[in-house]
Amino acid sequence: MSLNDTPSAERVHIGFFGRRNAGKSSVVNAVTGQELSVVSDVKGTTTDPVLKSMELLPMGPVVIIDTPGFDDEGALGELRVKKTKQILNRADCAVLVVDATQGLTPADQELIALFQEKDIPYLVAYNKSDLAAAPQLGEKELAVSAVTREGIEELKERIARLTRSQGEDKRLVGDLLTPGDLVVLVTPIDSAAPKGRLILPQQQTNRDVLDADCTAIVVKENTLAPTLEKLAVKPRMVITDSQAFAQVDRDTPKDIPLTSFSILMARYKGFLEDAVRGVAAIDRLQDGDRVLIAEGCTHHRQCEDIGTVKIPRWLGEYTGKNLRLEHSSGRDFPEDLSPYQLVIHCGGCMLNGREMDYRRKTAADAGVPFTNYGITIAHLKGILKRSVELFPDLYALLP
């Protein structure tokens, strides 16, 4: 994906599920108008989830996911079914492809139960309608044929209706601004920064400021103080990369609100309150306690990486405890969090809302406090209250 494309996390994720040879891959190819997936009469041709980011009318930017057969067998088959279940954790919408010549099976019914359990909007597409008539169709059902394309346009329209309202009103920072406001963005550029570009949360925040008809000034942490002195207008707020919190707090006058990209991202993803409540667990940590530090992506680690170097160092300095720190990255996230006393997650800019919510709920179900990098660093640096003063309800939660 190029830097000009919509980020994967901001695309609607549409998963196609079903038994082997129900025609999932054929339906996916018909919907996308591309040979996205290999098609064969051999059962189990799709052995791993196939993901494709694309623009698909009338939905717009989407990620299409073709999954292995849910009735796969054997040791490898069980692993494929497990991968299919993992896809459910990020699916904004599900399409169950059923072989119309065979009808609904127990495996199909199990998938429907999983959709309902996870509150995933779904449709049931009876494929091969050119070979057999579908049963009497319910509200969520329709007949399609990947061969003749019967029902394919209707399927696309109905998927669009299911997903149309998702994320429409979400803003990173624009809802906190009034047109004409001035916002200062602090973006450190160190050995861990990507070459030639800003990281995704910084890009997205900058764009949201502009979309709100406001002015963004982008500076490094070592030029913040002189920049503020030159301004004739007081900024509405200063937004910083969390790792520079301590210096930016010192250099930003107390009458200017201060927060971080990570904190705004937690709010955008819907778990900021959980993060604020969860960070208090740091003060209860004891020697030997297990802490999971989780990343949503698999970027190359540098010598001063925030997740594997800086946060562990600051945790040790703050708590004085001998903690057992463990790390996960990308899609590798533990299903059982009960052994941990705390989960510290990144901002989640590379994860869509569904997957971020799944991770938060997994921690909640295990009774494990869940927080994120920005809130953690603000707490460790003693500026948590200041970092959330833009959000009065959360500010009131803190002593």
Regions found by a protein language model. Give the residues of each.
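Short, flexible loop segments at the rims of nucleotide/cofactor-binding pockets, characterized by
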Residues: 41, 70-76, 99-103, 162-164, ...
